From Swiss-Prot:
Keywords: Cytoplasm, DNA-binding, Repeat, Transcription, Transcription regulation. One of its GO terms (biological process) is negative regulation of DNA-templated transcription initiation. PANTHER family: TRANSCRIPTIONAL REGULATOR MRAZ. Its main location: cytoplasm. This is Transcriptional regulator MraZ. It is found in: Cytoplasm, Nucleoid. Transmembrane segments: none annotated.
Length: 148
């Protein structure tokens, strides 16, 4: 289970060092085989391969005649990239994916349960600012009655 956020730096080759606290779990659960893809929020999603496979299968099962579904399939599946974590716990983020998410040197890796989100640090700060400005009427019905 991945949770919490960590400020990291991409190296000059676009490699991201996965925090040590997650490396053993990733090597044990997927042998370091990871899928990185685009998210509509202009961040990147990072999945262990076994977690990604049913998601990709589900996305492919939707009717592709719907323009909205086809567009989402193109974005998520069309940008999916298989990467392997090296012995130092690094993964290479491709140039097209870095460009899509606007990633600069300083990034934030945010645990989201079974996956991570990778954000440019400035965009992450804006996202968090937005998340803290909800008014009572802005809460989606799915979250009504939910308490932390």
């Amino acid at each position: 289970m991945f949770r919490g956020s960590t400020q990291l730096s991409l190296d000059s080759k676009g490699r991201l060092a996965i925090p040590a606290k997650y490396r053993d779990e990733l090597f044990a659960s997927c042998g370091g085989n990871i899928v990185v893809t685009a998210d509509p929020s202009r961040c990147l999603l990072i999945y262990p391969q076994p977690v990604w496979e049913p998601i990709e299968k589900k996305l492919n099962s939707f009717p592709s005649l719907s323009p909205q579904i086809r567009s989402l399939q193109r974005l998520i599946i069309g940008n999916a990239s298989d990467v392997e974590m090296d012995s130092s716990g690094r993964i290479l983020i491709s140039a097209p994916l870095r460009q899509f998410a606007g990633l600069q040197k300083e990034v934030v890796l945010a645990g989201q349960g079974e996956k991570f989100e990778l954000w440019d640090m400035a965009k992450w700060d804006l996202e968090i600012d937005t998340a803290t400005t909800y008014k009572d009427g802005d809460i989606p019905p799915e979250l009504e009655g939910f308490s932390l």
